[in-house]
Design a protein with these regions (language model features):
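Intrinsically disordered, low-complexity regulatory segments in ankyrin-centric signaling systems
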Residues: 1-67, 91, 100, 104, ...
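Ankyrin-repeat boundary/"N-cap" motif
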Residues: 2-7, 32-49, 74-88, 108-116, ...
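Ankyrin repeat A-helix N-terminal signature
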Residues: 9-14, 43-56, 84-95, 115-122, ...
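Conserved ankyrin/ankyrin-like repeat signature
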Residues: 18, 56, 60, 97-98, ...
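Ankyrin repeat domain, specifically the short helix-to-loop turn at the C-terminus of the second helix
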Residues: 23-28, 61-70, 100-108, 126-134, ...
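Eukaryotic tandem repeat interaction scaffolds
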Residues: 113-163, 167-173
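Ankyrin-repeat and related helical/solenoid repeat scaffolds used for protein-protein interactions
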Residues: 155-156, 163-210
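Leucine-rich solenoid repeat scaffolds
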Residues: 196, 201-235
Length: 235
């Protein structure tokens, strides 16, 4: 007997034949939503491969789309941000082959840059950029992915963004630069040196009017003094 449970099992197993037969028998279940407003495509995209080849997941997606699932439908939202199929692939399923298949069909690459950042997934970053995501994406957040990477200490991802054109001097909603955020967190010096290498300015005032140069100049670590002096000379 076809049920929501049996369809859920088929989707997670990438059993596209059972899924197709089940939806043929019970087309009324196509519109079912799981927790967090996930439709069957979102469930599929959030399912990890666990050693399986992605081809079956792609075929399962095709069955769902052929049966009428909307490629552009989202699950839950937070403000202007949307949990899209590609976001589920990037954030939970980590299935970039399926993500690219959906992107080729016209799925939006937006809303997924921070998910790639959280997972420190540069391959996902490159995939999203390939299909039109903005490196300094502000479509659903008030800060750029680069500042998100800095805030989450994803410094490798942050540098990957800089290498792909991100603005190293972007400011947060509160007017803070990456330098300000890192000084507040007490990040290791090597990350300051990395930002300086990419042209970060130290003369931009923060919310309290203090620049990164001023704050660095008061540090006990002489490496910060030297960097502050260098930034001051460049500014």
């Amino acid at each position: 007997m076809v049920s929501k449970t049996s369809l859920l099992e088929a989707v997670k197993a990438f059993d596209w034949k059972a899924l197709n037969a089940g939806l043929k028998e019970r087309p009324d279940l196509l519109s079912h939503r799981e927790e967090r407003e996930k439709n069957w495509l979102h469930v599929l995209c959030s399912t990890k491969l666990k050693g399986r080849k992605p081809a079956a997941s792609i075929k399962t997606a095709d069955v769902l789309l052929e049966r009428g699932i909307d490629l552009h439908a989202h699950a839950f939202t937070e403000g202007t941000w949307k949990a899209t199929p590609v976001w589920w692939c990037v954030s939970w399923g980590r299935n970039l082959s399926l993500a690219e298949h959906l992107l080729k069909l016209g799925a939006t690459p937006d809303y997924s840059m921070f998910a790639a950042c959280w997972n420190d997934d540069v391959a996902a970053l490159d995939l999203l950029l390939k299909y039109g995501a903005l490196v300094d994406d502000l479509t659903s957040a008030r800060e750029t992915p680069f500042l998100g990477a800095i805030a989450w200490s994803r410094f490798g991802y942050a540098e990957a963004l800089l290498n792909r054109g991100a603005d190293v001097n972007a400011r947060s909603e509160k007017g803070l630069t990456a330098f300000h955020i890192m000084l507040k967190k007490g990040s290791n010096f090597e990350h300051f040196a990395m930002l300086a290498k990419h042209g970060a300015r130290g003369d931009i005032p923060g919310t309290d009017g203090k620049t990164a140069i001023e704050i660095m100049s008061r540090k006990k670590d002489e490496r910060f003094w030297k960097l502050a002096k260098r930034l001051g000379g460049a500014g």
